[in-house]
Regions:
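Short, surface-exposed acidic/glycine-rich loop or hinge patches that mediate macromolecular interfaces
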Residues: 1, 27-28, 192, 241
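Enzymes that bind and transform nitrogen-containing heteroaromatic metabolites
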Residues: 6, 39, 74-297
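Proteins enriched for Cys/Gly/acidic motifs involved in redox and nucleic-acid/cofactor modification
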Residues: 38, 52-82
Length: 297
C-alpha cells in the first residue's frame, strides 16, 4: 500500500525498517496504488520477490480484486439439488434436500460474503431470515432483496437484523418511506422489461464497496443472474437422491448447440456428510483477475 486510506501507507514503514528482501503474493490492482509501492521499495534498494502463492492470494482476495479490476463484486450462486438437478418437489417442498453438514457449510459462505442476495419469490414462499446462524461470525452480512413490483411484506423476517438494501423496478414512495424509517435503503433500477436491471445493480454494488455477493434464490432469479453474466462461481450442494419432477436449480433458455453453453472449471469437490459440494468458476473471469494482479506485481 502506498496511499493514505484508513491508515498511512505501509510502504513507509517497510522502507524505514530497511529489510533486505520483501516477498509478496500479488500486486494491488487499486488504481491508487498499481505498483507504486513496489517501485518505492525497489528504489530504496530493497529486493522484491513477487508472485509467491499467487493463486492462493487471489482466492483469498477475489472479491476485492474483482471490484478493483472491473468495478463489480464477485458473485457466487449457491444452489442445492438432488442428483437429477431438482431443487424442490412439484408442490414446492424443499426442506431439507441436503443434510446439516451441507447447510452449515452454506452458512459459512454466507458469513464470508459482504452481502447475501435473494428474490421476492423466496421471501414469499419461505420467509427466510437470510442471515448466518449455523456458524459463528463476528458480523452479519448485509441483505439484498430483489423485487420488481415492490410487493414487499413489511413483516418479512429478512427485513430484520442486518442492514438491508432493496432493489426494485417500480416506485412506491409510501412503502419506501416506511422502510427508510427502519434504515432500509430502496433503489429503483428498472430495465426495459420492467424487471430489476441486474447489470446496473452489480455496478451499484461495486460503487458501494461490496466485494463478494452470496446469491441464494429460486429458479427464476437464479436463471436471470446466470443469463446476465452476474455469476462468477457456482456453489452446488448435491444430495444423494432422485426427485423426478420438480423445480429446477435455474430457469435457463433452451440451447440448440453445445458451444452455446457457459463453461466452468471445477475448483473443488468434497463430501459434506452424505452430500457433495461442488465449486466451479467461469474460467475466463478467474484468468482475467489473475492477469490483473500479475501485471500489477
Amino acid at each position: 500500500c502506498s496511499h493514505y486510506g484508513r491508515t498511512p501507507p505501509c510502504v513507509d514503514a517497510l522502507v524505514a525498517a530497511a529489510p533486505a528482501r520483501v516477498v509478496i503474493a500479488m500486486g494491488d490492482p487499486n488504481p491508487q496504488v498499481n505498483g507504486q509501492g513496489l517501485a518505492r521499495l525497489r528504489a530504496a534498494g530493497i529486493a522484491v520477490t513477487a508472485g509467491v502463492l499467487l493463486d492462493d492470494a487471489l482466492a483469498l482476495n477475489i472479491g476485492f480484486i474483482a471490484r478493483m479490476h472491473r468495478g463489480t463484486p464477485w458473485m457466487w450462486l449457491k444452489m442445492a439439488s438432488s442428483l437429477d438437478g431438482r431443487s424442490a418437489l412439484p408442490n414446492g417442498v424443499s426442506q431439507w434436500i441436503t443434510g446439516p453438514d451441507a447447510r452449515a457449510d452454506g452458512h459459512h459462505w454466507r458469513a464470508r460474503s459482504c452481502a447475501v442476495l435473494t428474490g421476492i419469490g423466496t421471501v414469499l414462499a419461505d420467509d427466510p431470515q437470510m442471515n448466518v446462524r449455523a456458524v459463528s461470525t463476528p458480523r452479519q452480512p448485509r441483505k439484498i432483496l430483489l423485487v420488481s413490483r415492490f410487493e414487499v411484506p413489511l413483516d418479512a423476517r429478512l427485513l430484520d437484523g442486518a442492514p438491508t438494501w432493496i432493489f426494485t423496478a417500480r416506485e412506491d414512495a409510501a412503502k419506501a418511506a416506511v422502510l427508510a424509517d427502519r434504515g432500509i435503503v430502496v433503489t429503483c433500477l428498472p430495465d426495459a422489461a420492467g424487471k430489476v436491471d441486474l447489470t446496473a445493480m452489480m455496478q451499484w454494488l461495486g460503487r458501494h464497496e461490496i466485494n463478494e455477493v452470496h446469491a441464494e434464490a429460486g429458479e427464476k432469479l437464479n436463471g436471470s443472474l446466470l443469463r446476465t453474466g452476474c455469476v462468477d462461481e457456482l456453489l452446488l450442494y448435491l444430495a444423494p437422491m432422485l426427485l423426478g419432477e420438480g423445480a429446477a436449480m435455474a430457469k435457463l433458455p433452451v440451447l440448440t448447440q453445445l458451444d452455446q453453453a457457459q463453461r466452468y472449471r471445477y475448483t473443488d469437490v468434497r463430501q459434506l456428510g452424505d452430500d457433495l459440494r461442488v465449486r466451479a468458476q467461469v474460467e475466463a473471469r478467474w484468468q482475467s483477475l489473475r492477469k490483473a494482479v500479475e501485471v500489477a506485481a
